[in-house]
Curated annotation (Swiss-Prot):
Species of origin: Homo sapiens
Gene that encodes the chain: SMR3A
Annotated S-S bridges: none
Keyword Signal (UniProt): yes
Chain's role: May play a role in protection or detoxification.
Name of the protein in question: Submaxillary gland androgen-regulated protein 3A
Main location as per UniProt: secreted
Amino acid sequence: MKSLTWILGLWALAACFTPGESQRGPRGPYPPGPLAPPPPPCFPFGTGFVPPPHPPPYGPGRFPPPLSPPYGPGRIPPSPPPPYGPGRIQSHSLPPPYGPGYPQPPSQPRPYPPGPPFFPVNSPTDPALPTPAP
């Protein structure tokens, strides 16, 4: 078994230093001559010039003008509609289901007593039993 392990180890080591399938075949030569330089960037205002700065977005200042009131000058906006208008049902807040301090339902009595199951045993002296015939 050691010889099989030794052979497989040598085989794996040899595979590390031999060309794989992706390296087989002759490599083509590099393209003839040097590569062409990239095209120059396109400047619409001529080479060597910096584009003009963008105009400020809100005029001469840095901040936009204040917004005009949506209801005109001096007008008071209408009050919001009532939350429970006609046709709406007002939701009642329900009290907690088990009162305060109960994170779970209150414990109920056990449906059966603890301990081993109870098997009723009728004693032979029980008057409810029929007497055996002699």
